[in-house]
Amino acid sequence: MVKIIYEIVPHDGGWAYRLGGVYSDRFNAYFGLLTETAIGVLKADIAFVSAPAADNDAAYHMDESVVRTKRAMLAASAHPCLMINGRRMGHTALYRLADLAEFRTIVSDRPLPPAIQARLEEAGTTVRIAYEEDD
């Protein structure tokens, strides 16, 4: 049986769950088999995941344990959402996280290259551009 630790943390509302596993100071998150197993018993409406690199086809990450945990999050979500810095488009990393078309929504800080945008639209992926509002 997997124990899910329920903890209230400072935020604007909702709940936060600390799933356990091996804590990484580098990524400020938990990873490993315990984390992946705990995610496997959950179902989320939406999962927001980030990636440090993406090319025309996929999102990538340089750490295997991060990829496994993020893949588990995507599998447990009804609406997988990728958040990516537009400057990271056109780059790859060692591990393939997911095909870009597997995400229902992609949020970037700048428009994606037209060829990628067209392919994602064909696949039914919504692309949103995040911006700061002027005060």
Which functions belong to the PLM regions below?
Residues K3-D135:
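Conserved phosphate- and dinucleotide-binding cores of soluble alpha/beta proteins
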